[in-house]
C-alpha cells in the first residue's frame, strides 16, 4: 500500500532491543487516546554486496519476526483496546522510519538501539529521526519512579517562537494522558537583551486559551537564568518528559547529543519533539 494512503497510526521502531519494547508499551496510551492503530515497524538493514549468501537474509528475517512477535505479545499483555499492526521492511531503519513519519501521527523509538550499549549515548537512529521526521517524535526512556500528579513534571520551554501554541497544546494533551503536572520555563542568558516580558506576555495569552480546555491539568511557570540543559539536570528524576519544538534545532541537537542524553537518561526522561503536525 502506498504510504500516503495509509490511515494515521502511532509508529514504533522495533529492533529487538528492550528499549524498543518499552517504547511500544509507552506508545499504547498514545494510540488508545487517539483511537488509531499502533504499528510495529522493523526495518531489516540491507546486506552489503556479496554478504547475502549462506542464509544471511533468512536469518535476518527470522530475527525481525521474532522481535516483532515479542513486542506484539508485550503490547497485548497491556490489555488496552488498541489495534496493533505489524510491518517489516527491507531498508535502513532511519530511512524506513522517516518514510513512515510522512503518514504517522507520532513515531516512537527507544533511546538506545540494539547496536548501542552505552546508556549515556542516544542511538543514531533516534537522533537522526528527531531532526528529520515529518511528524512528532518520541524518544522514550522508562521513568525511574512512579509517575503521579505530584511526582514528575512535563517540561516545555517557552522561547517566544511562533509555534508556542502548538507546543502548549501538545504538552497539555500529554499531561492529561500521563496524569502529570506541567512546568513551562522561560530561559534567559546573562548579558543577553531582555525580551522576557514579551515572551511571558505571549505565554500568558496562550495559556489563557489552553487551560480552560484542560482544567484538570496543573500548570506552573518558571523563569530560568541559564541553559535549559542545566535546569533539567537540576530537576533530576522529578521530570519525566521534555517537549521541544522541531524548529528549535539547537536544543533538539543538544538533548539528543551526548550531554543532553546523559541528563535525560539519568532521569529516565522521554523527549518529545513536536512540529506543526501534532494531532
Swiss-Prot record:
GO terms for biological process: response to stress. InterPro entries: Rossmann-like_a/b/a_fold, Universal_stress_UspA, UspA. Induction: A member of the dormancy regulon. Induced in response to reduced oxygen tension (hypoxia), low levels of nitric oxide (NO) and carbon monoxide (CO). It is hoped that this regulon will give insight into the latent, or dormant phase of infection. Disruption phenotype: No visible phenotype under normal or hypoxic and normoxic stationary phase growth, nor in mouse- or human-derived macrophage cell lines. GO terms for cellular component: peptidoglycan-based cell wall; plasma membrane. Coiled coil: none annotated. Pfam families: Usp (PF00582). Gene3D superfamilies: HUPs. PANTHER family: STRESS RESPONSE PROTEIN NHAX, UNIVERSAL STRESS PROTEIN UP12. Belongs to the universal stress protein A family. This is Universal stress protein Rv2028c. It comes from Mycobacterium tuberculosis (strain ATCC 25618 / H37Rv).
Amino acid at each position: 500500500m502506498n504510504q500516503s494512503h495509509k490511515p494515521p497510526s502511532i509508529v514504533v521502531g522495533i529492533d529487538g532491543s528492550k528499549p524498543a519494547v518499552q517504547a511500544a508499551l509507552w506508545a499504547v496510551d498514545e494510540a488508545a487516546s487517539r483511537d488509531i492503530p499502533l504499528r510495529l515497524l522493523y526495518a531489516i538493514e540491507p546486506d552489503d554486496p556479496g554478504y547475502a549468501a549462506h542464509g544471511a537474509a533468512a536469518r535476518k528475517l527470522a530475527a525481525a519476526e521474532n522481535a516483532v512477535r515479542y513486542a506484539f505479545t508485550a503490547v497485548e499483555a497491556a490489555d488496552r483496546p488498541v489495534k496493533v499492526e505489524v510491518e517489516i521492511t527491507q531498508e535502513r531503519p532511519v530511512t524506513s522510519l522517516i518514510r513512515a513519519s510522512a503518514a504517522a501521527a507520532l513515531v516512537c523509538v527507544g533511546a538506545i538501539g540494539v547496536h548501542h550499549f552505552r546508556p549515556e549515548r542516544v542511538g543514531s537512529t533516534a537522533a537522526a529521526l528527531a531532526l528529520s521526521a515529518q511528524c512528532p517524535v518520541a524518544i522514550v526512556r522508562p521513568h525511574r519512579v512512579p509517575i503521579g500528579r505530584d511526582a514528575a513534571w512535563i517540561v516545555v520551554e517557552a522561547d517566544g517562537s511562533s509555534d508556542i501554541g502548538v507546543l502548549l497544546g501538545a504538552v497539555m494533551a500529554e499531561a492529561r494522558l500521563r496524569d502529570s503536572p506541567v512546568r513551562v520555563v522561560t530561559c534567559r542568558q546573562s548579558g543577553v537583551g531582555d525580551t522576557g516580558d514579551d515572551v511571558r506576555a505571549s505565554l500568558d495569552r496562550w495559556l489563557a486559551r489552553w487551560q480552560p480546555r484542560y482544567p484538570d491539568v496543573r500548570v506552573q511557570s518558571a523563569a530560568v537564568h541559564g541553559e535549559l540543559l542545566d535546569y533539567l539536570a537540576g530537576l533530576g528524576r522529578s521530570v519525566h518528559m521534555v517537549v521541544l519544538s522541531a524548529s528549535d534545532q539547537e536544543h533538539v541537537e543538544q538533548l539528543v547529543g551526548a550531554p543532553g542524553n546523559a541528563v535525560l537518561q539519568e532521569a529516565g526522561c522521554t523527549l518529545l519533539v513536536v512540529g506543526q503536525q501534532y494531532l
